[in-house]
Every structure is written in C-alpha cells, then in structure tokens.
Amino acid sequence: MSNYLVVGLGRFGRSVAKTLYKNGKTVLALEQNEELVQQAIEYQIVDEAIILDVTDEKSLKKIVKDNFDTAIVCIGSDMQSSILVTLILKEIGVENIICKATNQIQGKVLEKVGATTVVYP
C-alpha cells in the first residue's frame, strides 16, 4: 500500500505532501485551516485534503480507519496536538508514524506514544 496521511499543511507538511504526490504516492492531508486545505487542492499537491480538527479522536478514527500504513505528523509547533494525534494513530494501527518535533523533549515523548521516526527540520 502506498497511501500516505499527512497531518498538518504548514510549510513542512506542504513540502512533504508535494514530494510524495510528485512521486506517485496517494496522499490524504488533514488540516484545520480551510485556507491551507484549499491551497493544497488548488495547487494539486495532494489527492485529497480534508478540513478537520485532528485532535478530535472520533473524527480522526472515522477518516483514517486502517487505510494508511504511513502517517506523517507535521504539527511540531503544537506539542499537545502532535502527541495526541500520534497516540490516536498508533491506536488505530498505523504502522509507520513519522513526526516533526521542535526539540529533543518533544521527540522523546512522541517516541514513547508511538512515533516510529522523529525528524527535527
């Protein structure tokens, strides 16, 4: 399966989504900012983008289910949200969870709750 979930469409998330999409991967992006979702669709950097509060466990589980083997959590600036999303994705059964972190402490916490890889862009 080459389906990727990108959570967050800030600069880092847009760059990740665009790279995956250009390389023929199926990309679903989740973002709470409507303007960023519209831009992603308009610039054709994803297959689909959905406006969603990703910290809403019920909504996230409904959309993600078990359709993705890799998720990239690109919301490093909001530590609480990145931790919560990572934990939910792990509970859903996403095998590979790559998370953006802004510091070593955040990275350690993300690994404890389920991140398989932490990046510090």
Where in this protein do the model-derived segments appear?
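Cytosolic regulatory regions of ion transport systems
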Residues: 1-121
